[in-house]
Amino acid sequence: MNPAHEPLPLEFYNKPTIELARSLLGCLLVKETEEGPASGYIVETEAYKGPGDRAAHSYGNRRTKRTEIMYREAGVVYTYTMHTHTLINVVSGGADEPEAVLIRALEPHEGLALMEKRRSGKKPRDWTNGPGKLTKALSITMNDYGRPLTGPPLYIAKGYEPQDILSGPRIGIDNSGEAREYPWRFWIKGNRYVSR
């Protein structure tokens, strides 16, 4: 672990999900592997507010093998696959409050050669500018499901304070009724790595 990248304490995650989605912007997501570390600053997130949010996997208190981790305490990893992509979420809420924040995009920081190799043939801007892209670039897999984010090999460290945060509707949730209009997607204004 790079001593400059001290993992954020568990207390950091103990805040309302919308607030956490905003607070994660500018933080550094780090994944250590045998090949070396790779990291990026979080520049885009989406909040999912559990049982009352039709876009959340836990809508209506659906408790399945896949969503079980969402019912734990905040500050652990919820990974799932969509098509051929693994996506990473930060579990929020508290025990039995199944909420999460999807990490949608990163600005590459460390391990650029590793990211280039893992995202072979892609332009640097396309390494991490989407939720399925960033997990490939950092080698985040389903094996990371349930990991605490408070220490290696996968953790979040303090980064920088964004100057300007924008919000709007979440992406790719067209079948979720009124929930598709909730302004629970957050991004750093002007950052070229934001997905759209």
Curated annotation (Swiss-Prot):
Nucleotide-binding recorded as keyword: no
Key words of the record: DNA damage, DNA repair, Hydrolase
A molecular function (GO) term: DNA binding
InterPro entries xrefs: Formyl_transferase-like_C_sf, MPG, MPG_sf
GO annotation, biological process: base-excision repair
DNA damage keyword on record: yes
One Pfam family this sequence matches: Pur_DNA_glyco
Spans through the membrane: none
Enzyme Commission (EC) number: 3.2.2.-
Gene3D superfamilies in alphabetical order: Methylpurine-DNA glycosylase (MPG)
Source superkingdom: Bacteria
Assigned protein family: Belongs to the DNA glycosylase MPG family.
Classification via PANTHER family: DNA-3-METHYLADENINE GLYCOSYLASE
Protein name: Putative 3-methyladenine DNA glycosylase
Source organism per UniProt: Bacillus licheniformis (strain ATCC 14580 / DSM 13 / JCM 2505 / CCUG 7422 / NBRC 12200 / NCIMB 9375 / NCTC 10341 / NRRL NRS-1264 / Gibson 46)
